[in-house]
């Protein structure tokens, strides 16, 4: 019998399948499906959509463009801001039957510190994800594209909380392992990747940009090969757990990410096509592991790396 249970940064999870931030609206899903959602929640942990210090309206429409193998989004992180999240969303998310990971993004170290301080305090929050894809207003640099900026940010927020800090990495860099290593040096407990790839779409009639913001981020099956490559590179570069994501739509594809060194996998774009994707991927992953003779996800972890899994399996999750 294959046991899917994993320990992630000291948080026990029933299985390694979680959601990508902003791809599954648990509050809306509960309104639609009622308490049945709580009885059969599709993920072992829930990652909130990214919140910012102040409310954001998001980008102008149009915001989505479907591609033959995925989609380009330019949502722009619309959210209620920190106070609105704590007052209105957190009480509802706190009722979910799984650990809650809250994603935050600031424009400066001071904003990140305020967000971490506010989000880490409530007992409902198990861990925080730092979205480092926004330009720093002080340096003009995108934090997650610069190892030194990433390390500096982690050093600034690490003393604020003992709860796990996960750094969400951008794929739009030449050496993701260097950024991940800097995050680890700064005190990160885990990293997650990949975020979306920079992309654009043109209106076939006008030959002008279709998206209201001009460009956006590509996700879905089109990015899966890139994601696996970067997960492997990062898993080989750090000793902290890796959450792998990017175009996962089946258990076999989830297993590829585990073999690439991921401790957890996240389902993202597939949730828009199939709201029950998390549960299905989990079932299929269990069967894939059983069929191949693995007794747990850990037994498959890192098998594709140059020195298979022995190093990864010895690491604490």
What label would you give each PLM region?
Residues 48-53, 128-134, 190-200, 247-248, ...:
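Glycine-rich phosphate-binding active-site loops on the catalytic face of alpha/beta enzymes
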Residues 1-100, 106:
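N-terminal capping/small domains of soluble enzymes
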Residues 29-35, 112-122, 173-186, 236-238, ...:
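Catalytic cores of alpha/beta
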């Amino acid at each position: 019998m294959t046991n899917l249970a994993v320990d992630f940064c000291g948080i026990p999870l029933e299985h390694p399948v979680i959601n990508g931030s902003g791809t599954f609206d648990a509050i809306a899903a509960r309104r639609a499906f009622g308490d049945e959602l709580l009885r059969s929640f599709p993920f072992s942990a829930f990652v909130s959509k990214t919140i910012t210090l102040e409310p954001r309206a998001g980008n102008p429409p149009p915001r989505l463009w479907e591609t033959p193998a995925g989609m380009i989004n330019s949502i722009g992180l619309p959210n209620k801001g920190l106070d609105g999240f704590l007052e209105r969303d957190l009480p509802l998310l706190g009722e979910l039957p799984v650990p809650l990971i809250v994603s935050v993004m600031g424009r400066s170290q001071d904003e990140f510190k305020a967000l971490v301080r506010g989000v880490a305090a409530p007992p409902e929050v198990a861990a925080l994800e730092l979205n480092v894809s926004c330009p720093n207003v002080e340096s003009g640099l995108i934090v997650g594209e610069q190892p030194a900026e990433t390390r500096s940010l982690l050093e600034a927020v690490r003393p604020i909380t003992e709860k796990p800090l996960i750094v969400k990495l951008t794929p739009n860099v030449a050496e993701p392992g260097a950024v991940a290593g800097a995050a680890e040096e700064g005190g990160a407990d885990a990293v997650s990747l990949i975020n979306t790839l920079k992309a654009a779409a043109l209106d076939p009639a006008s030959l002008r940009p279709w998206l209201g913001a001009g460009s956006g981020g590509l996700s879905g099956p089109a990015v899966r090969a890139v994601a696996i490559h970067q997960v492997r590179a990062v898993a080989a570069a750090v000793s902290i757990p890796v959450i792998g994501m990017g175009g996962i739509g089946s258990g076999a594809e989830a297993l590829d990410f585990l073999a690439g060194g991921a401790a957890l996998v996240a389902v993202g774009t597939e949730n828009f096509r199939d709201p029950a994707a998390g549960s299905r991927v989990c079932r299929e992953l269990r069967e894939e592991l059983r069929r191949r003779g693995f007794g747990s996800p850990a037994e498959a972890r890192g098998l594709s790396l140059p020195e298979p899994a022995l190093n990864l399996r010895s690491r604490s999750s």
